[in-house]
Amino acid sequence: MPKMKTKSAAKKRFKITGTGKIKAAAAGKRHGMIKRSNKFIRDARGTMVLADADAKIVKQFLPNGL
């Protein structure tokens, strides 16, 4: 059987940490920041670790562990 291909969209958006967790950028930061609270803007800065349910789905898109 041939190797499974990695989803190109997923490899651009997610990183796997050394412990196997999935890191991604926080959502909701593209536009409309004027109506967001300062706390939301601060908390959405940088990256976050995905929840276990979401990480399980993303790992299917990254079979070779990029």
UniProtKB/Swiss-Prot annotation:
GO terms for cellular component: cytosolic large ribosomal subunit. GO terms for molecular function: structural constituent of ribosome. The keyword Transmembrane does not apply. Keywords: Ribonucleoprotein, Ribosomal protein. It holds the Pfam family Ribosomal_L35p. GO terms for biological process: translation. Gene3D superfamilies: 4.10.410.60. Belongs to the bacterial ribosomal protein bL35 family. This is Large ribosomal subunit protein bL35. The lineage of its organism: Bacteria, Pseudomonadati, Pseudomonadota, Alphaproteobacteria, Hyphomicrobiales.
